[in-house]
Each structure stands twice: as C-alpha cells, then as structure tokens.
Amino acid sequence: MWKKIATISSLLSIAAALMALPGQVMAAQTTVHGARIWNAPDHTRIVLDIAAPIPYKVFPLDNPPRLVVDLTDARLKGKLPGVDSSDVLVSGLRSGVRDGDDLRVVMDLKQAARIKSFELDPNDTYGHRLVIDLSPKDPGAAMLAAATATASPAILKQQGATRSPASLSVQPKGGRQRDVIVAVDAGHGGEDPGAVGRSGTREKDVTLAIARKLAARIDKQKGMQAVLIRDGDYFVALRQRISKARKHQADLFVSIHADAFTDPSVRGSSVYTLSNGGATSEAAKWLAARENRADLIGGVNLAERNDVLASVLLDMTQNATIEHSSIAATRVLAKLRSLGHVHQTRIQQAGFVVLKSPDIPSMLVETAFISNPDEEKRLRNGSYQNQLADSLLGGILDYFREYPPPGTRFARGPSRSPDAASDANDDLIGPGSSDAPNLLARGD
C-alpha cells in the first residue's frame, strides 16, 4: 500500500518538474535547416527549408525597407546565406530569437517590394519549404538597376555574357524589316536542378551554358535576335516561359534539355514537339510527364496559377503551330544527326506544357543523356557545347530560310512551298503530324 502511494507521489513530482521546464522541452521546436536565395531579373525568391509545416507571419517594415518573417516555435540550424550584390531587391539576410521560442528572419531590402509567400509539400528533391517571392513595386526602376548591375565588366566576365542590351529592343514600325526573334529556353533552374549525372553534373547548368552559346550565335546573324528565357540560376514556371516568349513576339521557341534514364548505356539526342493527340511513344509520354513536374519541384503557388492559354482560341492556330513546330524540329534533328548519334531518328510528340504556345512554333531538344557517363562528360565540355549550339543554329536557319516570317530579312529570298517540304519531312516526323503546313505570320 505505502509503496504504491510512494510511486504515485514520485510520478506526480516528475510531472510537476516537467511542467516547470521551458516550453521547448514540452514541445520540440521546428527546425529551419537553412535558406536559399535565387536572384532573377524581375524577382527574388527566398526559400526556407523547414522540417515540417509551421505557423508563420510575413510583413513589411519601412524606414528602411525590410521584410520580416516570424516563425512560431522554430530554431535555425546553421547560418543564413549571403546575398549577391547584384540582387536588385535584397541587400541582406539576418535572423534572431524572438520571445524565447520563435525565430525571426529579416530581409533588408533595397526598395519597396510586393510580397507573396506560400508553403510547398515535399517532393523527390526537397522536403517542406516556405517560399517568399519578392518583386519590385516599381518594375521600371528595377529593370534599370538590373541593367546597370549586369553592365559591370566583372559580372559580365563572370557570367560569360556576350549579348548586347539592344538585342531586346522593340523593333521600329513602318517599312523597315523586323528581326526574326528566337526564344531560347534553358530548361529547369533555381530550385529545380533537372536531371543529375553520376559525376554530379546538373542539367540546369548544362542547359544554361548551351542556351547562352546558342543565343550569342543567333545575335550574330543579320536580321535575327535571341531572347533568353532564363539567363541565370533561377526558377521560371513553365507557363511563364511561354508568356515571356509571347511577350517578345518570338517566331520560334527552342527549349534545351539533357535527358536521363535508368539505363546508363542509353545515349543520343532527341527532338520533341507538342502533340495534338496522344504521345508517339511511351518514352515520349514518360518524358513529358517528368518535364511537366518542373513546376512542382521548382515551386509554383498552385492557388495563383493562371493558364495563359485559357482565353485563347486554339483550334486552327494551334494546329498550324504544331505543323510548323514539326518542320522546324526536323531541320534541327537533321543537324544533330550530322553531329553524332541520335536516340530517336524521328520527331517525337507528347503533351509538354512548355510547348503549348498557341501561336509560336516550339520544340524541346534533349541534347544528350546526362545519365550516360560518356555523354555527361561531353556535356560539360565547352567545345562540345559549341558544336551543339552550331547544330541547333544550323537547323533554325534552315527552317527560316524555307519559311521566312513576313516582314523579315529572310522573306526577301525564295522560300520553299509547303508541298515541296512535306516529302522531306515524312522520314523525320513521327505519327500524328500533318504533311503540308500553313504559313504562319506574327500575330496569327
């Protein structure tokens, strides 16, 4: 009897002692494992890696401008990263303990900013994340600041930039001929590394290097301009890539990628276009599904997604665009074939989101298999990247010489008729595509 009373008394004493301890013993704090900052020309993204979903509050402060993120019952593990001096929005990042148990992260801002914040669930690459997107309240001032920062010789040398700011200038109206605009899209970026080779080569780095080389070659052609959809290591949502190409009134959209497969012996290049029906193969269907997951990996606020195609009538315009996409893709595939081994000898088709522009012929080029050790090594090689850029340019030039957009320098020379081109396309275009394309004009 007395032993039971003593045991109960001891348990009550232990419980009372635990209740007297600080709150962090009673309830474990959520760990913030670290942060990443992605600096894009028109926005800055700060990502906090959190161990679990967490109550948080985001609010701005003035004089000087700051952004505060308060996280309830949280602690920071490690240090916060430094901020690139070229960032037009954020000048510093710091943290401190608040009210004993909470974590406060403060972002020192260079100017007032629009703020969006949202949490992301875990995926194959990352765990739980808290994302804060900042964009300038005055976009014009931000663009000027970004242009000034990019003009620094040190930064230009570091980025390997060779393009002139004039390459994005608006074409004059009137009787003058306009330039052909090619949107060059480096796949993945920022939070989304894409495929990763056995030696650690990241697809997002390889695609950006090739895209820059291709853009530089396009800009050197008379009557042509390139628009880089991504010109740094930051995330661009798939539909935003389409929107940027359409904003610049591109005549062609080329998305550059590096393929991956479980079998490391698989190798070679492939070229894909949008399908208005089913995929041409299970492999094409699988690849499209993988690439379309980029938004989930890179981080898109699903509550705010707005389909750029929702208000556009796609019927005949989309069909004509797909036809021209296939023709342009065959020209590029032919040049890649002359460079070396191709994985798919015919154009493949599937439902790639990034190719769904209703009025811009679009293609996705898998330059090589980054999962193949030999091809991974070649993809890292600057000389091979140059060869790929040359092949892509050659195919693009062949297409525009045959189908010159009205009002451009290319339109002065002779062009092939759709009927003459159809026979040449039969050997390269996969099932489901038409033979004779309709001519496309900008604005169709």
Language-model regions, residue ranges each:
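Bacterial N-terminal signal peptides that target proteins for export
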Residues: 1-13
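Signal-peptide-cleaved, periplasmic/extracellular N-terminal interaction regions immediately downstream
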Residues: 2, 25-182, 428-431, 436-444
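Structured segments of extracytoplasmic/periplasmic soluble domains
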Residues: 38, 53, 110-112, 137, ...
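Flexible glycine-/small-residue-rich
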Residues: 50-52, 71-73, 109-111, 133-136, ...
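Active-site-adjacent mobile loop/cap segments within catalytic or ligand-binding domains
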Residues: 69, 262, 313-414, 429, ...
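Catalytic-core regions of hydrolytic enzymes
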Residues: 152-307, 318-331, 386, 409-444
